[in-house]
């Protein structure tokens, strides 16, 4: 459901997604669904991203578009500034320059209120958007694959953050949630 950015941040979010310049509606919908499943408070689509109400995006979200906070944002720089002012740490998903995700977790970075900044499917985040983040973080690739699909990388990052938030809140870090 559409919400203003101020309403999202006014509710003290712990986990937020910023989709910057995401163009593929299937990936965007899958990111929405993954964010919802990981317990994120909202997903922000930058002004240069695909329309989240594109029919392919809605289908790929499998209904999550209707029950996660959805912000139709403006310029990424303004969005990042607003989120930082609301107390969120902004992490840029970047496999080229980022510290490995498995090194960020033990430092406690992921347990803080976090906004994940994800870029375009084809070329990731440009340098000007990378510079907006508090730090770049990448999903390590142990095999021969060149990279991960946007939705796959988002899933790894969001679930790792969700686990860190649960552990930080005193929850059982190893508990398996009940399935539906």
Regions found by a protein language model. Give the residues of each.
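RNA substrate-binding interface of SAM-dependent RNA methyltransferases
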Residues: 2-98
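Generic leucine side-chain signal with a strong bias for well-ordered alpha-helical environments
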Residues: 15, 19, 83, 125, ...
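Structured adenosyl-cofactor binding patch, chiefly the S-adenosyl-L-methionine
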Residues: 34-38, 49-65, 127-180
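Generic hydrophobic alpha-helical scaffold/packing signal
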Residues: 71, 77-84, 91, 102, ...
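A broadly tuned preference for mixed-charge, low-complexity surface segments
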Residues: 72-80, 87-104, 141-148, 168-180
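Active-site/ligand-binding-proximal alpha/beta "capping" segment
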Residues: 91-145
């Amino acid at each position: 459901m559409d919400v203003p950015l101020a309403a999202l941040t006014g509710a003290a979010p712990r986990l937020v997604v910023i989709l910057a310049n995401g163009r593929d509606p299937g990936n965007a919908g899958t990111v929405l669904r993954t964010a919802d499943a990981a317990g994120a408070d909202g997903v922000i689509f930058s002004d240069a991203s695909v329309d989240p109400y594109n029919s392919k995006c809605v289908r790929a979200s499998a209904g999550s578009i209707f029950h996660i906070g959805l912000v139709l944002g403006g310029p990424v720089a303004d969005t990042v500034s607003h989120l930082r002012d609301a107390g969120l740490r902004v992490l840029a998903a970047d496999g080229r320059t980022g510290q490995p995700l498995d090194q960020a977790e033990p430092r406690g970075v992921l347990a803080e209120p976090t906004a994940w900044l994800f870029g375009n499917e084809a070329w990731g985040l440009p340098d000007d958007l990378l510079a907006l983040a508090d730090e770049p973080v990448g999903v390590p690739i142990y095999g021969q694959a060149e990279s991960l699909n946007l939705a796959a990388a988002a899933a790894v990052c969001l679930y790792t953050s969700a686990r860190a938030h649960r552990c930080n809140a005193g929850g059982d870090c190893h508990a398996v949630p009940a399935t539906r």
